[in-house]
């Protein structure tokens, strides 16, 4: 049995990052709603290998009546507890401290970079710092996002960290092994966040670092076999990383009981349909049915400009096609999807009490209530880096596993506004040029291609025209935007600082080789505030 960390979710959009950081430390973690049954929590800790509990952040205020609280049993089981942001505030409130809102303190909400001074030598922070002051105080560079603040420590707690604007930025009761931070150690902006979480799970909770993808394969295969039995499964194959790894994992578990349905909706990357068939049907021996549905999708999307409406239409059409194909497969009872954690968090999916919806994902947002197929989502609890690690462990080729993510709705969410076949054709060719040049351009320092140095890169079609000059003539043609980001987890991302020579070459090639486009721009927005995809 794996040692485990229980994460109680109070509705933060980055709760999954906590789980990712714990798993980075090779410790298994599970996320459950903050108001789950206390008996479940007791069994998780006492019978299922639970070694510690983390309380997440959230959008509520503990100063308001009826705001969420941690089940009291959390503080009675004798295991370490770590509170983060709202988790710190509810811990303080429930254990006898005090919390006040920014408004009542006459302060503004604190959001962004901050430098925190560590106090004393707690077991959690001892020796962890980014730099020290001339007085010898250890300083941490962290990310804050809060309105309320703890104003009085609970009995038996001591001050662990502070800033000028947040005098109690961390607290600790070392006898009970209760710790809490106002800042977010789970986000990459907190430089020592990984070290803090590793210290908590390894040295405070004494968890064994035994969570590896090889173990996950064995467990997932067993679970899939028990779940599916002798029934048939169909999987929507896109050729992207997630659906590819899901197909390989399910095929490992049930072999020919899996049939992949590859829907060519006319919104794929250039020549992608043929490449997908070559990779799966011929190289991996997986049963694949190719469905040419371009005209159907284009018809459904005619006149639709709203991005949420497009996603819902594309998702619904996918499901209907799968249902139709399942009728041709004897005993088909399951629809498999490559849904992963970021899909769920961006959809404010199951378990996200109080979370705010950002955008829906086609895997979780467009499923009809009367769907005749049961859902099989073997990657639902994994982050992108874990999915890639799993793909390698399954023996998939590197070019498949490390291919950049591609959205389920395809170019439907990379063509702003209404989707037209003309726009799709222009975008396919522009995007292919961008990716080709990224693969062919090697960074002198790392000796890696810029494709490998970026986490996701693509072109976006803008349904606006601009004036240009080609030869002696005036042109009035469309604009494409190039987007390239670098990220560790896809929850936050930085725009990639591509070489100007590379961008210039891509722009020249697109304008000269793709008739209908006369202007190329580069997106330099981070996430947040922007999302990675434009729609």
UniProtKB/Swiss-Prot annotation:
Record keywords: ATP-binding, Glutamine amidotransferase, GMP biosynthesis, Ligase, Nucleotide-binding, Purine biosynthesis
E.C. no: 6.3.5.2
Species classification: Bacteria, Pseudomonadati, Pseudomonadota, Betaproteobacteria, Burkholderiales
PANTHER family: GMP SYNTHASE [GLUTAMINE-HYDROLYZING] (PTHR11922:SF2), GMP SYNTHASE-RELATED (PTHR11922)
Pfam families from the UniProt entry: GATase, GMP_synt_C, NAD_synthase
Residue span(s) of domain Glutamine amidotransferase type-1: 4-210
Keyword Nucleotide-binding included in the entry's annotation: yes
EC class: ligase
Function: Catalyzes the synthesis of GMP from XMP.
Protein name per UniProt: GMP synthase [glutamine-hydrolyzing]
Residues annotated for ATP binding in this entry: 238-244
Listed InterPro entries: Class_I_gatase-like, GATASE, GMP_synth_C, GMP_synth_GATase, GMP_synthase, GMPS_ATP_PPase_dom, NAD/GMP_synthase, Rossmann-like_a/b/a_fold
Pathway: Purine metabolism; GMP biosynthesis; GMP from XMP (L-Gln route): step 1/1
Domain GMPS ATP-PPase residues, every copy: 211-403
One GO term describing the cellular component: cytosol
Keyword Transcription regulation in record: no
Reactions accelerated catalytically: XMP + L-glutamine + ATP + H2O = GMP + L-glutamate + AMP + diphosphate + 2 H(+)
Subunit structure, as described in the record: Homodimer.
GO MF terms held by the record: ATP binding; GMP synthase activity
Residues forming the catalytic site: 85, 184, 186
């Amino acid at each position: 049995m794996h040692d485990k960390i229980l994460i109680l979710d109070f509705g933060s959009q980055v709760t999954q990052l906590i789980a990712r950081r714990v798993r980075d430390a090779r410790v298994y973690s599970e996320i459950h709603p903050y108001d789950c049954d206390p008996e479940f929590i007791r069994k998780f800790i006492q019978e299922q290998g639970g070694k510690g509990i983390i309380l997440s952040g959230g959008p509520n205020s503990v100063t308001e009546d009826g705001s969420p609280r941690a089940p009291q049993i959390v503080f009675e089981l004798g295991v370490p507890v770590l509170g983060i942001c709202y988790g710190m505030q509810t811990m303080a409130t429930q254990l006898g401290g005090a919390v006040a809102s920014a408004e009542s303190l006459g302060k503004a909400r604190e959001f962004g970079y901050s430098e925190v001074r560590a106090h004393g030598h707690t077991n959690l922070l001892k020796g962890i710092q980014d730099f020290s002051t001339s007085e010898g105080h250890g300083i941490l560079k962290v990310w804050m996002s809060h309105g309320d603040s703890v104003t009085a420590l609970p009995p038996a707690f001591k001050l662990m960290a502070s800033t000028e604007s947040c005098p109690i930025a961390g607290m600790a009761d070392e006898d009970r092994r209760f710790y809490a931070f106002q800042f977010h150690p789970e986000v990459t902006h907190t430089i020592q966040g990984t070290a803090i979480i590793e210290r908590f799970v390894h040295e405070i909770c004494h968890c064994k670092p035994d969570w590896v993808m090889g173990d996950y394969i064995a467990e997932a295969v067993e679970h899939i076999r028990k779940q599916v039995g002798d029934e048939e499964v169909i999987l929507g194959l896109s050729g992207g990383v997630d659906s590819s790894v899901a197909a390989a994992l399910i095929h490992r578990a049930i072999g020919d009981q899996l049939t992949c349905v590859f829907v060519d909706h006319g919104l794929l990357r250039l020549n992608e349909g043929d490449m997908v068939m070559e990779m799966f049907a011929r190289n991996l021996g997986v049963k694949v049915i190719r469905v040419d549905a371009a005209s159907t999708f284009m018809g459904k999307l005619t006149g639709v400009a709203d991005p949420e409406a497009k996603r819902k239409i594309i998702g619904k059409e996918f499901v209907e096609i799968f249902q139709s194909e399942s009728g041709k497969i004897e005993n088909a009872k399951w629809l498999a999807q490559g849904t992963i954690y970021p899909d769920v968090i961006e959809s404010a999916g199951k378990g996200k009490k109080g979370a705010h919806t950002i955008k829906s994902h086609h895997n979780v947002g467009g499923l009809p209530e009367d769907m005749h197929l049961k859902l099989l989502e073997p990657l639902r609890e994994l982050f992108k880096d874990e999915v890639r690690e799993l793909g390698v462990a399954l023996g998939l080729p590197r070019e498949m596993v490390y291919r950049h993510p591609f959205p389920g709705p395809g170019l439907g969410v990379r063509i702003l506004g209404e989707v037209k076949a003309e726009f799709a054709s222009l975008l396919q060719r522009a995007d292919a040029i961008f990716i080709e040049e990224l693969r062919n351009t090697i960074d002198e320092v790392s000796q890696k291609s810029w494709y490998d140095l970026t986490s996701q890169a693509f072109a976006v079609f803008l349904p606006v025209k601009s004036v240009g000059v080609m030869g002696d003539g005036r042109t009035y043609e469309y604009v494409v935007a190039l987007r390239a980001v670098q990220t560790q987890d896809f929850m936050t991302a930085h725009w990639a600082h591509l070489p100007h020579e590379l961008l210039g070459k891509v722009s020249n090639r697109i304008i000269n080789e793709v008739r209908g486009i006369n202007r190329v721009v580069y997106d330099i927005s981070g996430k947040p505030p922007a999302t990675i995809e434009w729609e």
